[in-house]
Structure formats: C-alpha cells, structure tokens
C-alpha cells in the first residue's frame, strides 16, 4: 500500500550539472523539511551525454551552500527506463522539452508527465535559463526560480 502513495519526479536539463541538480536539491530539501521525503523518489538527469559522471558546477554548489542546501549528485543521461518509472519529468527550457518529447515517443511504456518546471512558477517565468556561461548571480536566479517552482509543484502534486 505504501508503494502506491510514493510519487516520483525527475528534473532534467541539458548537461545535468547546473539547473537540474539545483532543482533536485531544492525539492529534496522541501520534502525533507515537510517530513514527506519517504513519499518521494527524486533524481535529475541530462538530455545530452556531455557531462556524464561529472559533479555539479562549482558555482551551483557554492550557491546551494550559501542557502544551506545539501547537494550531492553525479551527472547522468536520461534513460528509457526513466520515462517508464517516473511520474513527472520536469525540464528547464523548450529545447529540453523537445528532446524529451522526442525521446518519450520511442518508449512504449512512457508514464511520465513531461512539463516545463517553469510552468509552475507563480511569477510566470516559464524558462529557467542555463547559467553555465553566466556568473554567480545567474546561478542565484536559477536557485530562486527553482524554489518558487518546486514549492508550487509540490503543492499541486502532494
């Protein structure tokens, strides 16, 4: 019975070293703080294979440390199994969404609801821009967007 009440979310971006690990860490903290972490399976992944095996970008790690949010992740690429086992796959931009929809069409047993994480933003900022070529303030912007979106998503999905 407990198995049925477990929900799952996979956060996805291009390389799985900037945006999606931040979203994953933010969401983990939210469900931990609300004592519902045992009800959620949370992970993140990349649409590409560029960064597989790498840790999150050091600027993202610094940002999370400043906010007191633990972050430990190793970049991985999304798999066919992810589409069949996650309830939600939340991505960061239109390019991610196109890639995910294309990949999901190749999976017969896709059960995941694929959406932009930004679609949950109360401030209506639909796209979470890649901060890779930016600076610390760009990572802070991503963090703030992820906090708003993850809170709203949890409210709806809980």
UniProtKB/Swiss-Prot annotation:
Q: What is the lineage of its organism?
A: Eukaryota, Metazoa, Chordata, Craniata, Vertebrata
- Tell me what this protein is called: Low molecular weight phosphotyrosine protein phosphatase
**Which top EC class is given?**
hydrolase
Subunit relationships: Interacts with EPHA2; dephosphorylates EPHA2. Interacts with EPHB1. Interacts with the SH3 domain of SPTAN1.
Family membership, please give it: Belongs to the low molecular weight phosphotyrosine protein phosphatase family.
> Reaction catalysed by this chain?
O-phospho-L-tyrosyl-[protein] + H2O = L-tyrosyl-[protein] + phosphate; a phosphate monoester + H2O = an alcohol + phosphate
Q: Which residues carry this modification: N-acetylalanine?
A: 2
So what EC number does this one have? 3.1.3.48, 3.1.3.2
Entry PTM: Phosphorylated by LCK. Phosphorylation at Tyr-132 increases its phosphatase activity.
Which organism encodes this protein? Pongo abelii (Sumatran orangutan)
**What's this protein's function?**
Acts on tyrosine phosphorylated proteins, low-MW aryl phosphates and natural and synthetic acyl phosphates with differences in substrate specificity between isoform 1 and isoform 2.
Compartments reported by the entry = Cytoplasm
Phosphotyrosine is found on 132-133
CDD domains per the record? Answer: LMWPTP
**Can you tell me which residues form the catalytic site?**
13 (nucleophile), 19, 130 (proton donor)
Keyword set, alphabetical order: Acetylation, Cytoplasm, Hydrolase, Phosphoprotein, Protein phosphatase
């Amino acid at each position: 019975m407990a198995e049925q009440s477990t929900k799952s979310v996979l956060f996805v971006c291009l390389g799985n070293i900037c945006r999606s690990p931040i979203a994953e860490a933010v969401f983990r903290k939210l469900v931990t703080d609300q004592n519902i972490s045992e009800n959620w399976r949370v992970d993140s992944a990349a649409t590409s294979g560029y960064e597989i095996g790498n840790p999150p970008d050091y600027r993202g790690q610094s940002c999370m440390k400043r906010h007191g949010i633990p972050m430990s992740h190793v970049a991985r690429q999304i798999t066919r199994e992810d589409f069949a086992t996650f309830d939600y796959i939340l991505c960061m931009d239109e390019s991610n969404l196109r890639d995910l929809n294309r990949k999901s069409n190749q999976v017969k047993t896709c059960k995941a609801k694929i959406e932009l994480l930004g679609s949950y933003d109360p401030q209506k900022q639909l796209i979470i821009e890649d901060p890779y070529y930016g600076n610390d303030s760009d990572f802070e912007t991503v963090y703030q967007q992820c906090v708003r979106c993850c809170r709203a998503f949890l409210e709806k999905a809980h």
